[in-house]
Design a protein with these regions (language model features):
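Membrane-interface helix/loop caps of multi-pass membrane proteins
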Residues: 1-228
Length: 228
């Protein structure tokens, strides 16, 4: 998301000198809302038939918070631990990440536009600083408040900003990993980092934290050295 959104915004700013928030959010709504509404409508009859009253009330609340892109806060304050068995009765638990993403979409374009217009030469430093601070918060939070750490944008933002940094470098420097040998080798290394995390991360692994840097780096390597 960070790579794609930053690429879209920066290309528009560089090409036109301006940025249309209206068109940006229209595109996001058209991409996200139809699928979200379909899932909600498809799951509602089954929830009505099979969930007990208490679980159905929770289900209905999760729908409302999901529509408001704040379900991450709802699930945190309701004490829901992601991956716990109780999550099986919360079909919209996965929308926490969509909420984090949409919160990023609301805040990031404004910050990027202001920085680009008035502090352009510091833009990359701003992105890197945001990445480092967010990663530091995530690593601290993983040990001190793991549930809050899991659900909120300040400790998840670095994962998105990693893509933003890649997009900035590509757009401003024009580098895309043109060496064919490196293009063959490094995507495999990136895939290894991701698969290693899938196989060896477990319930005892602090996440998100410095450990999470491994799969995020893997994704970044694949993006950077891919031909398309």
């Amino acid at each position: 998301s960070g790579y794609l959104i930053t690429s879209i915004i920066l290309k528009e700013l560089i090409t036109t000198g301006s940025f249309s928030f209206k068109h940006f959010y229209e595109r996001r709504i058209r991409r996200i809302l139809p699928a979200l509404l379909f899932v909600m409508l498809a799951s509602f009859p089954f929830a009505w038939m099979y969930l007990f009253s208490g679980s159905f009330i929770d289900f209905s609340k999760s729908i409302l918070y999901s529509l408001g892109f704040s379900s991450n806060f709802y699930f945190y304050f309701s004490g829901q631990q992601y991956g716990a068995e109780s999550g099986l009765l919360k079909p919209f638990l996965h929308t926490w990440s969509l909420s984090v993403e949409e919160q990023f979409y609301i805040l990031f374009p404004v910050l990027l536009l202001v920085t680009f217009k008035y502090f352009r030469k510091y833009l990359i430093y701003t992105l890197v600083l945001g990445f480092v601070v967010s990663l530091g918060l995530a690593d601290w939070g993983s040990r001190n408040n793991p549930s809050f750490n899991f659900y909120v944008l300040p400790t998840r933002g670095w994962e998105i900003l990693a893509g933003s940094i890649l997009a900035y470098i590509e757009i401003t420097q024009g580098h895309r990993g043109k060496n064919k040998t490196l293009n063959l080798i490094f995507p495999s290394i990136g895939l290894f980092l991701i698969v290693h995390s899938i196989l060896f991360f477990n319930d005892e692994t602090f996440h998100p934290s410095l450990y999470t840097f491994s799969p995020v780096l893997g994704v970044c390597v694949i993006i950077w050295f891919s031909n398309k």
